[in-house]
Regions:
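Hydrophobic anchor at the beta1->P-loop junction of P-loop NTPases
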Residues: 22
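Hydrophobic positions on the alpha1 helix immediately C-terminal to the Walker A/P-loop
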Residues: 33
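Small-molecule kinase domains that catalyze NTP-dependent phosphoryl transfer to phosphate-bearing small molecules
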Residues: 84, 129-136, 143-148, 152, ...
Length: 259
């Protein structure tokens, strides 16, 4: 994505290939699911949340007020964000610098949540995202793909889970070392989690922050977080990762024409 004045394609214009839209709250597992479906069906994987994170990171670096929309919009319009699809997600370049890891830090996550509530900034982002997916053949994940970015997407999945499960997933993602030999199914991980008092406090803090973000996302004026009327809701609260991936594949196949 760059600051271009090229015309943005109409989202309802005829595409060469389908669009798979994955929406849902923070920590639901959208990135993992999107990467899997992109590999399985030979599509590009585009993580729109990385675009908000990149703008938030640049706002942090420029000491901008996250509550002032116009300076943030001006910043976004002068920023070059490039998403390079990889096997496990996107490589994110901010003005030519790889920030793929930095944008996952907790300060950027918190800033992105505040930046994303501004309606004019979201409208600008939607135009960029439509341009990225105009030809189809993409799995695009975010919070308003099926409702605002591509309301005519051929496949729409709303991936959800309870706040407690999402909070635990996010905690383990950012705070706990990953054991490659351990059982990685969600129920096994949840049952095996033995936290120290400090870890438990950190986990509770992440849960509070996640609930606060849920509240902001669901109540913002522009493109609030909600399932599209024709989306298939996939609740992963009690499912293993393999079960989520299998059910999502079935959903995609049921909505696409036979090869």
């Amino acid at each position: 994505m760059s600051n271009s004045n090229d015309a943005v394609p109409n989202p309802t214009a005829r595409r060469q290939r389908p669009v798979i839209a994955i929406d849902g709250p923070a920590g639901a597992g959208k990135s993992t699911l999107a990467a899997h479906l992109a590999r399985r069906f030979g599509f590009l994987n585009l993580e729109t949340g990385a675009m908000y994170r990149a703008v938030a990171l640049k706002a942090i670096e420029n000491d901008l007020d996250f509550d002032e929309e116009q300076p943030l919009l001006d910043l976004a319009e002068s920023t070059r964000i490039r998403l390079e699809p990889q096997m496990e997600g996107n490589r994110v370049l901010l003005d030519g610098v790889d920030v793929s890891r930095r944008i996952r830090d907790t300060d950027v996550t918190a800033a992105a949540s505040r930046v994303s509530v501004h309606p004019h900034l979201r409208a600008w982002m939607v135009r960029q995202q439509r341009a990225l997916g105009a030809k189809g053949g993409v799995v695009m994940e975010g919070r308003d793909i099926g409702t605002a970015v591509f309301p005519d997407a051929e496949v729409k999945i709303f991936l959800d889970a309870s706040p407690e499960v999402r909070g635990d997933r996010r905690y383990r993602q950012v705070a706990l070392p990953r054991d490659p030999d351990a059982d990685q199914s969600e129920p096994a991980q949840l049952a095996a989690a033995q936290h120290t008092p400090d870890q438990l406090a950190d986990q509770q803090r992440l849960l509070r922050e996640m609930k606060e973000r849920d509240e902001r996302d669901r109540n913002r004026a522009q493109s609030p977080l909600r399932p599209a009327s024709d989306a298939v809701i996939l609740d992963s609260t009690t499912l293993t990762l393999d079960q989520v991936l299998q059910q999502a594949e079935q959903i995609v196949r049921s909505h696409l024409p036979p090869e």
